[in-house]
Amino acid sequence: MAGDAVTVVLPCLNEEESLPAVLAAIPAGYRALVVDNNSTDDTATVAARHGAQVVVEPRPGYGSAVHAGVLAATTPIVAVIDADGSMDAGDLPKLVAELDKGADLVTGRRRPVAGLHWPWVARVGTVVMSWRLRTRHRLPVHDIAPMRVARREALLDLGVVDRRSGYPLELLVRAAAAGWRVVELDVSYGPRTGGKSKVSGSLRGSIIAILDFWKVIS
């Protein structure tokens, strides 16, 4: 699939430090779309300076930012990755290629690099939620879709309504209900390259995310 058919949506809240390297790693021909979700730093300025399209989404929440980015995209394929540098955008082409093989949604399973400190709350939450997705929804996944690609129109038609941390989990649940073919591939996962995690960076953030997840999955 041609690169110009893909928009990479990057939801951002205060990611000025990590954005330059993240944007530089996006595959040639892919379009970068940064959604500034109430940043108090120079996220929007840095993104524009490095060639990304910038969309401002004032409604707080990860799901709000992702949805705004998908709406603003004009390509047939959309990809979503975190903007903190923890994942390698170079993994995206292999995910996109699975769409041509019949997949409806392709997600990344994080494989930590050697020596990475992955907070135990985040690890346990991921294990529990992915187990629930496998046993209750028959999805062949071991992670909660931190990196993902899908066809834009089909994604919008799926009607995901969560605008907080539960967005990716609801996406998977709705994909299962719709009979989508979901494929999960390994992707590299390293330390964030700047800033502070909005989820695992604090106990409060982790607990809020887990509650959002459980609300979707229960």
Swiss-Prot record:
Pfam families attached to this UniProt entry: Glycos_transf_2 (PF00535)
GO molecular function: glycosyltransferase activity
Domain of life: Bacteria
CDD domains given in the database record: DPM_DPG-synthase_like
Keywords for the protein's UniProt record, in alphabetical order: Glycosyltransferase, Transferase
EC nos: 2.4.-.-
Top enzyme class: transferase
Gene3D superfamilies tied to this protein: Spore Coat Polysaccharide Biosynthesis Protein SpsA, Chain A
Coiled coil stretches, renumbered: none
Membership in a protein family: Belongs to the glycosyltransferase 2 family.
Official protein name in the record: Uncharacterized glycosyltransferase MT0564
